[in-house]
């Protein structure tokens, strides 16, 4: 994604329409997290489609965070997406039957935070956002899976891995 982001930035210089396309796609990025689906392996064809959707969502997260690092997307916009996903995560962990959605949000948070927290931290105007993100990660690693209906050990360990980047 880093290579693609670099290439895309160069294409934007030669083809200004690429900038408009980037903005349109970025503006619809948050909506990708409104319809996270889960299908059991029993329906294999649909299961494969959902896995592709998840892979695409993660690739787009990586692409946009690398565009931020290239200066194409403002750090505040990625910061806002991270904060919104943190809120969605907290909302979902208390609901029954949301383990897969929580895991998918966690995977994307991992990508966005791991690759973007340094850029957010160096932007002096985003101290509050940086503090909010790091506090969120520090809090999540204290959670107990038994206290939340849709919080798995897999998600907890992913956040423990993420702590080293915050």
State the predicted function of each range.
Residues 1-166:
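Alpha-helical interaction scaffolds
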């Amino acid at each position: 994604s880093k290579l693609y982001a670099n290439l895309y930035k160069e294409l934007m210089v030669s083809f200004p329409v690429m900038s408009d396309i980037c903005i349109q796609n970025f503006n619809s990025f948050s909506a990708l997290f409104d319809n996270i689906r889960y299908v059991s392996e029993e329906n294999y064809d649909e299961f494969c489609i959902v896995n592709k959707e998840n892979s695409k969502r993660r690739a787009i997260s990586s692409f946009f965070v690398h565009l931020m690092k290239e200066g194409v997307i403002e750090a505040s916009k990625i910061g806002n997406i991270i904060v919104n996903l943190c809120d969605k995560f907290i909302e979902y962990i208390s609901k029954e039957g949301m383990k897969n959605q929580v895991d998918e949000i966690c995977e994307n948070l991992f990508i966005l935070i791991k690759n973007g927290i340094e850029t957010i931290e160096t932007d002096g105007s985003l101290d509050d956002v940086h503090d909010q993100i790091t506090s969120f990660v520090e809090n999540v690693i204290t959670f107990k899976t038994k206290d939340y209906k849709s919080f798995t050990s897999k998600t907890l360990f992913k956040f423990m891995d993420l702590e080293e980047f915050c």
